[in-house]
Amino acid sequence: MFLTACGFSPVYNENNTTKLIQQISIQEPSTQEEFIFYSHLVDRFGSMGDKYVLNYAISTSTEDSALDFDGTVHRIEISGSVSFSLKDKENGINLLSDKEEMYLSYSNAGSTAAVLNAERTTNKQLVVLLADKVADRVSIAIVEKDL
C-alpha cells in the first residue's frame, strides 16, 4: 500500500498483466527452440494480438566447461541469447529492442541416454528462462511507457 502513495505501482498487479493479454502478436516459430520460446510467451501473453508485434532471434552454443587433467569433459555449458524487438503494429515504431543472455550447464557423466536427456532438458530450461526474461522486459517496458 505504501508503494502506491509514492507513485510506484507493481508491474505484476492484475491490471498490468491482463492489459497485455491478447495485445502482442508473437513471431511464429520455425525451430524446436523457437517453438518452446513461442509457447512460453503465448502462455504469458496469449496469441494473435493486434496492438504490438514481438520479433526475436535465438542462438545457442555448447562448450566444454569442466575438464580434468587428462582432457575428460565432466560438464557441458549451453549458452543462449535472444535478440528481440517490440514494435507498434499500427505504425511500425520500435518500442523496445534488446538482447538477453544466460547459460546453464549439465553433467556429462553417465550413460549416453542420461547425457542426451540432460542436454535436452537443460536446453529446454535455458529457452524457457530466456522467454521469461523477455516477457518480463516487455511487461516492464509497456508499464513504464504507459502503452
Segments predicted by a language model, with ranges:
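Bacterial signal peptide processing site
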Residues: 7-10
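Short amphipathic
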Residues: 23-29, 98-102
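Acidic/histidine-rich, surface-exposed loop or edge segments in extracytoplasmic proteins
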Residues: 18-27, 111-114
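Post-signal-peptide N-terminal segment of Sec-exported extracytoplasmic proteins
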Residues: 27-59
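Sec-exported extracytoplasmic/periplasmic mature domains
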Residues: 42, 46, 131, 135-139, ...
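C-terminal motif of bacterial Sec signal peptides marking the signal peptidase cleavage site
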Residues: 2-5
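Surface-exposed short loop/turn segments
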Residues: 49-99, 103-121, 128, 132
